[in-house]
């Protein structure tokens, strides 16, 4: 692969334009002889987690393929699982542009995308068309114009539609770019949401005779006490997995760098240490009762190993993939 050359060209463009251009090309070559240029031979390293069998422990994090447009392309690159979304019940445009910024010196990204997506029905059609044989996770959220007190209704609508097509479902309550969303991580609001989610999961299990695990994605900007409370809620409600972590609002990590004052969530290398520490603390509180999918700043084999040593059973990449390309998948999976 010639990703360094492609990256040089893409990084001359606005980040969102570069993303759209890349996706157009991936869709164009998938299923043709030109797929050879993205296909990689990856070691098979099966992992069982949440009752599912994964080809290898490295997945694509949610947010890159929001609508499930390029599932087969990412599968060809060697991901052991692919998480698509965040998707909402209705299509929405997201926040105003520009809304995505590269912090190149720190290999970070700041985004305030705002759950831009074409809606859950469109995503389901894309999943049905995909030929990828690995686990597909579907990450769900609420529409921006849905009041937060009615947010759980949006999650239940999405669950109804995606359940028969999902390998697992991720409840995203930790994006900083949807007003009020992170309040669902705490106290009664979290318990109320998780209770409704588990009831819906039980109904759908009976309907489809299939158990689809549910994971909850949390933020890195949590105190130790908040992590303890979240872990307790996850255990009490028999949630199947925890994904740690989403992006951070702490911009001190990139102070003085270009775009460091932009609003939105910071991802990539700057969040690496904090994410790993959250995984370590969460692992201690969950006491092996619930597996953790570790994400946040994984940009090397060493960073991947640190996440697993901290307590992650599976890991995901996003920003590291943008900066290092498909070779990062091969480096991690073949040597982990």
Curated annotation (Swiss-Prot):
Pfam families: DHO_dh. The keyword Cell membrane applies. Binds 1 FMN per subunit. Catalyzes the conversion of dihydroorotate to orotate with quinone as electron acceptor. Belongs to the dihydroorotate dehydrogenase family. Type 2 subfamily. NCBIfam families: PRK05286.1-1, PRK05286.1-2, PRK05286.1-4, PRK05286.2-5, pyrD_sub2. This is Dihydroorotate dehydrogenase (quinone). It comes from Photorhabdus laumondii subsp. laumondii (strain DSM 15139 / CIP 105565 / TT01) (Photorhabdus luminescens subsp. laumondii).
């Amino acid at each position: 692969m010639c990703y360094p050359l492609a990256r040089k060209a893409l990084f001359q463009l606005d980040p969102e334009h570069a993303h759209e251009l890349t996706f157009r090309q991936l869709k164009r070559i998938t299923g043709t002889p030109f797929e050879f240029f993205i296909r990689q031979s990856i070691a098979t390293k099966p992992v069982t987690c949440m009752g599912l069998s994964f080809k290898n422990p490295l997945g694509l994090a949610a947010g890159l393929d929001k609508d499930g447009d390029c599932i087969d392309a990412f599968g060809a690159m060697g991901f052991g699982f692919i998480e698509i979304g965040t998707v909402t019940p209705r299509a929405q445009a997201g926040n105003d542009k520009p809304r995505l910024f590269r912090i190149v010196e720190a290999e970070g990204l700041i985004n305030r995308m705002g759950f831009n997506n074409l809606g859950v029905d469109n995503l389901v059609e894309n999943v049905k068309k995909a030929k990828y044989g690995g686990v597909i996770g579907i990450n769900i959220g609420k529409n921006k114009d849905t009041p937060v007190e009615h947010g759980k209704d949006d999650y239940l609508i999405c669950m109804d539609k995606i359940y028969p097509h999902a390998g697992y479902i991720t409840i995203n309550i930790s994006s900083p770019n949807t007003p009020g969303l992170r309040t669902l991580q705490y106290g009664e609001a979290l318990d109320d949401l998780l209770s409704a989610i588990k009831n819906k999961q039980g109904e759908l299990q009976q309907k489809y005779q299939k158990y689809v695990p549910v994971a909850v994605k949390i933020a890195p900007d949590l105190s130790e006490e908040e992590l303890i409370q979240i872990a307790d809620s996850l255990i009490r409600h028999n949630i199947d997995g925890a994904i740690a972590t989403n992006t951070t609002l702490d911009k001190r990590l990139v102070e003085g760098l270009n775009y460091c004052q932009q609003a939105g969530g910071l991802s990539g290398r700057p969040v690496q240490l904090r994410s790993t520490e959250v995984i370590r603390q969460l692992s201690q509180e969950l006491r092996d009762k619930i597996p953790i999918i570790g994400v946040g700043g994984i940009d090397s084999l060493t960073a991947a190993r640190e996440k697993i040593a901290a307590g992650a059973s599976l890991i995901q990449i996003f920003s590291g993939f943008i900066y290092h390309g498909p070779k990062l998948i091969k480096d991690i999976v073949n040597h982990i």
